[in-house]
Amino acid sequence: MNLKRLLAGCGTMALVLSMLSPALAQVDLGQFTAQGSVEAGAIPQPVPYDDAAAKYQEYRDLAQQFIVPKLQLILGDKAEKYYVQFDAVNVAQKNQMYSLRFGEYGLLDVQAKFFEIPHFFSDHVASTPYDENGSNFSLSSKPTGTGAALHSWLEANDKPFDMSLLEGVADINVRYTPTPSLSFSANMNYQNPTGQQPFGGSFMFGTSPGTFKVNELWVPTQYYTYNFGTGAEYAKNGWLVGFQYQGSFFVDDYSTLTWDNPLNTSGAGGNCVDSTTFTSTSLGGPCQGRAAMYPNNQAHNFIVNGAGQLPFNTHVMGSLEYGFWLQNAPFIPLTSNSKLQQSLSSVGAPNSLGGDVRPFFANLTIDSNPIERLDLKATYSYFDYDNQTPAITFTGVKSLNDVADAQTPFTAYPFSFSEQDVSLEPTYHVTDTIAAHFNMKWQTNHNAGLEVLQQDQLSYGPALDWNPYPWLSFRADYQHAHRDSPGYNNNRTSLVEVLGGTPGAIEELQDLRRFDEATLDVNQTSLYASVQPIEKVTVFSSFSYDDYNYPSTDFGLQHTSSYSPSVGASYDPLPTMHFFGDYSWQAYDWNTRSLDESTLPAPTPPAGKTSVWTAKGRNQGNNIDLGMDIAIPQNRILPRPSHLKIQYTYTVGDNRTHQAGDTAAATPAINYPNTGTEFNELMVQYEYDLRDNVAINVGYYFSNFGEHNFMVDQMANFMPHASANSTFLGNTDMSPYNVNVGFITLKYKF
């Protein structure tokens, strides 16, 4: 079979080659001219979509026997008034792209593009006992119990299937300029992902992984995003004013996902009977689970912008934007269990959200060069996220076993915030070879419905550019930032109000893990140097370091730091030869503190024990890139010019975690195994000019991926070490692979 594919590919190339004849640089078509190119060929041994190459094929398509990597056509009139350009990449493949541009110079420009983005998860690796119809998942049979009975039922009824997404994207942009001062524009963007992706449908969460009741499913994805825009601009005498409208509409074909409960063993399909008996380990409960998918929504934004020139070589630009973001999709019912007699109205909740956000954005930038050696740039921006969504209060909710939830009534409040930023960036050219910079930025946030009502952050630092010689350059910079976030309060009434519980205990601890709102100190620095020791050789090196500290956070994330040195070189012995290589190393360190919440509100551990866990970790990686790009002139061996490209990439990463400490119950912290990945890729491409307008292109790709990750290596449909009551897809998108791909194409220019 492999030989037949190879012969078929070579035969196709020979047929195309026999049809070609010498051509001019362009083709005359009366008053018009045409030029372009087409490249077509074959992959003698395609890479199938299967588990062996799942990760390699994740965002590409090499499963086709015959390929058209590129096609281009350019049309124009001899008076150079009109133009048309058409480009196609990866024709008829899952990662195909087509673009068209045409118009009249100085008057009309139309650009259209369509492309597809594949996302391949796996092929017949995941398996499930469910049958899917739209967004409804049903079971034709049920297990007789949990544990071994659930395992046996899965082995007898699960069916393998493939999971992948294919997103189609279309863009159209039109610009019309009737006069040099006035222009109109319009654009449209369309996005449509379709396919399947993993989803965890849960009936109940317990206090540990061993008490989960999880039914992992896949999401049948079919939604649409429509983005529209239109605008006008008027410019004259160094000033510009413009207006834009931008609208976005999101539509989901599947608003609700439902699935049969395998652990309600009263019967399958219509024979199932709902039950109020429902615990983390028992049978029974509702016949179906239900979850809401992405809700339909829309957004409208109106923008006014302007720019102009002022005295002292100063330029100013600014914009104002106001919008309406709306979402009013119906709520799904509170429960799918018919034995729990409650509805949205019975608990005091509306039928839909009534979501209404009114964003406002203002921006002003001034760029000035008042004296020869001084450059100034100042920016002010203001963003207001005005959330006018009404608060919703729930009363008398029955969560399990027809028993009222102890935490009701509770109210869900919307959150709002506003942010102001002021930045100043002066640059002074001390000499012709030295430039000194200073960057300063002040940022303040005013919040409503968040744990911190106000946050203030100030960042500042110098930078220096030094270029003493044309062949030598240096750059160094440093930034320090401090964010002040006083008044942590997770029980603020403007948040989700929960009655019951102990203020300052568990609720406060949950807040202290919100590191995005915590007091923060940041130090960042970077260095860069480039030198040409000889004319043909360039050597460069860089180093960056980031350090984040959370001084007011007792529990949660305490500290992170990252640093990345790198070095590289390039060598150009001839104008037609280029060799390069670089090496980089990255490391990210972190540490956290956590508390055994089961001991609250009075955490008094036994003697010799502590209720605090500490964890430290490092994610690090190494990367090497080597390559060459050579344009080979004609010689005695090769009578016509040719082109050779070779590139090799090696990447290895390792993630480590170390935990220490015992809980008050004397349960030790768990140290998990290290995880990591390794990646190798070699790309070789050789192009030889058979004629002035005909070239043959031969390429070879080798790719290798390996991993050691206990979290995905043990994936299975039934995992008793995690739960005896749950079903999983058994899928992984981290499968190791070795891939060899060769291709041959013919390129024809006219």
PLM feature segments, named:
Residues 2-24:
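Gram-negative bacterial Sec-dependent N-terminal signal peptides
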Residues 17, 33, 43-44:
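Primarily extracellular Gram-negative trimeric autotransporter adhesin
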Residues 23-39:
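N-terminal Sec signal peptide and the immediately downstream disordered periplasmic leader
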Residues 27-30, 44-102, 106-750:
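Gram-negative and organellar
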